[in-house]
Amino acid sequence: MINKSNLIGLTCISFLSYALTGALITITGIFLENISKYFNIPITDMGNTFTFLNAGILSSIFISSWITNIINLKTQLIFGFILTIIATLILIFSHNLTYFSISMFMLGIISGITMSIGTYIITNLYTDQTRASMLLLTDSFFSMSGIIFPIITALIISNNMKWYWVYFIIGIIYLIIFLITINTKFPIIYTEISKKRIKTWNFSILCLSISALLYILGQLSFISWMPEYTMKYIHISINQSSKLVSAFWMAYMVGMWIFSFILKFFDLKKTIITLSGISLFLMSLFNIFYDYALLYIIILSLGFFSSAIYTIIITLASQQTPLSSPKTINYILTSGTVGTLLTFIITGPIVQKYGIFSALLVSNILYGIVFFLVIIFATLTKTKPIHD
């Protein structure tokens, strides 16, 4: 039986693991132009370079389970801290794009594995009654980083400090993880390998996986290019632009908390159609208005109403098989991560050819496709009732 202090320590590690990944992903759009000038390359090429971060996160999904069978969780976290120091030092002292790309890939793998450990800890330490709420609370730390770190990044850039100090500050998150890790006893967690195969890899799961991929791709494409768009075309400062990003993630976090309590009272299929439709409408509004105060209200609303879409997709996917399967959920999570990976691969060439606003239009189109996909899904499938 794990004692209370260890439980608190392990839970804090889980929270911080999501905060780490959130910090790395959500700051990109804020200093994209600044860092492209540092390396003297076009902004679209710089955006493509950040694909190495997303590729590292995607790679971590495939290697985390294998590593856990060889190296215990505590050792993984200690080793991750050492690699974080190395990657950060490379960013600070090397003025080389190749080394920058390697560091991004390293940070992607480190954060991805650390986040997998965080999820693994929560799902194994908490019972069915508290697991869902703890996972939701853990996931909200990703959004919390999306509120805090864009503001920190904007302050660093606006005060003429070098961009790499942002990564130094992000590294402090892993320092805290490291300090908690060395003072916490990790339980031996055994994994059960289910021999049952999922035979229902049907249209419904395929439809939901595509929806997850396109939703994350649309969301991150929008939030990555939106700061640059607003600074160039609406002529606002980097601080105002960062506040828009933070407002989105703040509303996203609040939305996750609120929807976690009210979703059980509504039909999930009708809810996801409603939320995706509202999100599509709000993003369309953002793309046609130029008033900062109005855009702030729109992006707050967009963050709130889109916050539950990904969670509902995962929940609906788990209901498409006779028994809720980790394999099904992992399939949806992988699809979402692929969406993350494709963010700059897809939008970079589009921005280079058609301009920054085209990235926002692509995001709008992707949200439109998700809206129609969930309508098709709801029309053609039946959903199991949710059992507490």
Swiss-Prot record:
Location of this chain's protein in the cell: Cell membrane
Predominant location category: membrane
Keyword hit for Cell membrane: yes
Membrane topology: Multi-pass membrane protein
Keywords linked to the UniProt accession: Cell membrane, Membrane, Transmembrane, Transmembrane helix
Taxonomic superkingdom: Bacteria
Key word Cell membrane present: yes
GO-annotated molecular function: transmembrane transporter activity
GO cellular component: plasma membrane
Pfam families in the record: MFS_1
Gene3D superfamilies noted in UniProt: MFS general substrate transporter like domains (1.20.1250.20)
Cross-referenced InterPro entries: MFS (IPR011701), MFS_dom (IPR020846), MFS_trans_sf (IPR036259), MFS_TsgA (IPR023528), MFS_TsgA-like (IPR050375)
Segments traversing the membrane: 12-32, 51-71, 77-97, 102-122, 137-157, 163-183, 203-223, 246-266, 272-292, 294-314, 331-351, 356-376
PANTHER family linked to this entry: L-FUCOSE-PROTON SYMPORTER (PTHR43702), PROTEIN TSGA (PTHR43702:SF3)
Family under the similarity heading: Belongs to the major facilitator superfamily. TsgA family.
The protein, known as: Protein TsgA homolog
Organism name: Buchnera aphidicola subsp. Baizongia pistaciae (strain Bp)
